[in-house]
Curated annotation (Swiss-Prot):
Keywords: ATP-binding, Cell inner membrane, Cell membrane, Membrane, Nucleotide-binding, Sugar transport, Translocase, Transport. This is sn-glycerol-3-phosphate import ATP-binding protein UgpC. One of its GO terms (cellular component) is ATP-binding cassette (ABC) transporter complex, substrate-binding subunit-containing. GO terms for molecular function: ABC-type glycerol-3-phosphate transporter activity; ATP binding; ATP hydrolysis activity. SMART domains: AAA. Its main location: membrane.
Length: 357
């Protein structure tokens, strides 16, 4: 096992536009870190630079306190698991897992010991003589992980390994990955566009946006205290409600359009007249009544999800989603009265997108 360190790493293809803005990252020995973000945010490019498949434009990469920035991938002590499995179709499972050890000159006994140990961990022992075409998608992905495990790397790199699996199998493989990490405790850097994978697998999450690490932190911290509008809108399903408005001239209210005025938890005279965006997660919106000061919402759509329901409407022309318990099924066109507890507010500067404290 080893630590992984990125020091002011950047990437530019034309010398003008930085695809990856300077990023610093310390992944502790045995830590599982997930990079998440939309397509084109730079997460896979950053992973490929750690692997040595892409050159850094500037900055340095260290694995186990050794500078590896200019080393070839084979010399970095890493093993990579890809989205498309990358198995040799003419080889059986054993030979696919053993191949990298054979070309590195390992003896037959050591190869068999390593392959069989990985196969036992991944429950592949009965499948060692099968060809990839005889395996399910989940079994193929386990073989790909087994091929990485036998290398006994300092760092595991995962590039969207579950993207090709169906929804049910993804859930199963997420659990298997968690159990695998708990057993091996190998330092891991994992890339995904799926926030559920990020939140369930990671000890720390890096939220990427346009080549910038918008926020790095524990999944619970990122969910509860998003550092920017982007993080607030990207993490969470359904997404956080975000309402543009402004602080009143006396610094005591947040006004959404002309009809909704929310009293701030405490006066903010320094924010007078400032354009802000208020965020509240759908599950934090509470049912209220007209008499208790609730805000009316006319229901335009209702999504019945089984365990709960999502009520949709608009305030001042801006979308509202409220998560209701399954027994609340308001009719389309009816009015709900809602309360936004100030303890669940997230305020952001509408111009910079940064969190306001």
């Amino acid at each position: 096992m080893a630590c992984l360190k990125l020091q002011a790493v950047t990437k530019s293809y034309d010398g003008k536009t930085q695809i990856i803005q300077p990023i610093d990252l310390d992944v502790a020995d045995g830590e599982f870190v997930v990079m998440v973000g939309p397509s084109g945010c730079g997460k896979s490019t950053l992973l490929r630079m750690v692997a040595g498949l892409e050159r850094t434009t500037s900055g340095d990469i260290y694995i186990d306190n050794q500078r590896v920035t200019d080393l070839e991938p084979k010399d970095r002590g890493i093993a990579m698991v890809f989205q498309n499995y990358a198995l040799y179709p003419h080889m059986n499972v054993f030979d696919n897992m053993a191949y990298s050890l054979k070309i590195r000159g390992f003896g037959k006994t050591q190869i068999r010991e390593r392959v069989e140990e990985a196969a036992r961990i991944l429950e592949l022992m009965p499948l060692l003589q099968r060809k990839p075409r005889e395996l399910s998608g989940g079994q193929r992905q386990r073989v790909a992980m087994g091929r990485a495990i036998v290398r006994e790397p300092a760092v595991f790199l995962f590039d969207e390994p579950l993207s090709n699996l169906d929804a049910k199998l993804r859930v199963q493989m997420r659990l298997e990955l968690q159990q695998l990490h708990q057993r091996l405790k190998t330092t891991s850097l994992y890339v995904t566009h799926d926030q559920v994978e990020a939140m369930t697998l990671a000890q720390r999450v890096i939220v990427m946006n346009k080549g910038i690490a918008e926020q790095i932190g524990a999944p619970s911290d990122i969910y509860r205290r998003p550092a920017s509008l982007f993080v607030a809108s990207f993490i969470g399903s359904p997404a956080m409600n975000l309402w543009a408005g402004r602080i009143s001239d006396d610094g005591c209210r947040f006004d959404i359009g002309e009809d909704i005025a929310l009293v701030l938890p405490e006066p903010k005279p320094q924010w007078r007249g400032k354009a802000l965006t208020l965020g509240v997660r759908p599950e934090h919106i509470q049912l209220a009544t007209r008499e208790t000061g609730g805000i009316p919402l006319q229901i335009s759509t209702l999504e019945l999800l089984g365990a709960d329901n999502l009520a949709h409407g608009k305030w001042g022309g801006q979308n509202v989603i409220a998560r209701l318990s399954y027994e609340h099924c308001p009719a389309i066109g009816s009015t709900l009265w809602l309360h936004l507890p100030t303890s669940s507010w997230h305020l952001f500067d509408s111009q910079s997108g940064l969190r306001m404290e």
